[in-house]
A protein has these predicted regions:
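Core beta-strand-centered patch of the WYL/Sm-like small regulatory domain
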Residues: 1-84
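Polybasic (Lys/Arg-rich)
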Residues: 68-165
Length: 165
């Protein structure tokens, strides 16, 4: 964002990862309990890099674990949620996307009597996932959790109100 405030951070670079067509610098830090935590920094937002003499802890980074329960670009924070979606039978293209996509951990897919695909997954509810649900609201019905359904309804109402403003 060009209008964002400029911030200088000291980070511990661990790995460079390309995810969903975006290049990230993954940096490690120690949380208040002494556990290793990792954050993603988008390369295109990094203006400059300066090397320091500061000692860096040895970080053990596992990309598969870092992106566990994730949908899209963002690595999740907090506890992942159990999510169930119904992909309408009329939306074969979207059903095929779930057939070909790779999730970690694996998602469960089954069909109901009306040939709607029921997808059960455990993931972090991220901005990518919320935007995806909004963009596919006509093809996807949120079965659970109810809190996710309410969040998406509020976002859709807000978007409609903005269009009329």
């Amino acid at each position: 964002h060009t209008d964002a405030e400029e911030v200088t951070l000291e980070v511990n670079p661990v790995k460079v990862i390309m995810r969903v067509d975006t290049l990230y610098l993954v940096a490690g830090e120690m949380d208040e309990k002494g556990n290793q935590a990792f954050k993603n920094y988008v390369f295109e937002r990094i203006d400059s890099v300066t090397e320091t003499n500061h000692a860096m802890p040895k970080f053990v980074f596992d990309a598969k674990l870092h992106y566990k329960y994730c949908f899209g670009k963002y690595s999740g924070q907090g506890t992942p949620e159990d999510v169930s979606l119904e992909i309408k039978s009329s939306s074969k293209w979207l059903q095929s996307q779930f057939e070909r996509s790779h999730f970690y951990p694996e998602i469960s897919k089954r069909f109901d009597k009306n040939k709607n695909m029921i997808v059960d997954m455990k993931l972090h509810v991220t901005p990518d996932f919320l935007n995806w649900l909004m963009g596919n609201a006509g093809e996807v019905r949120i079965l659970k959790p109810a809190s996710l359904k309410e969040s998406v309804k509020k976002l859709l109402k807000k978007a409609l109100a903005e269009m009329d403003a």
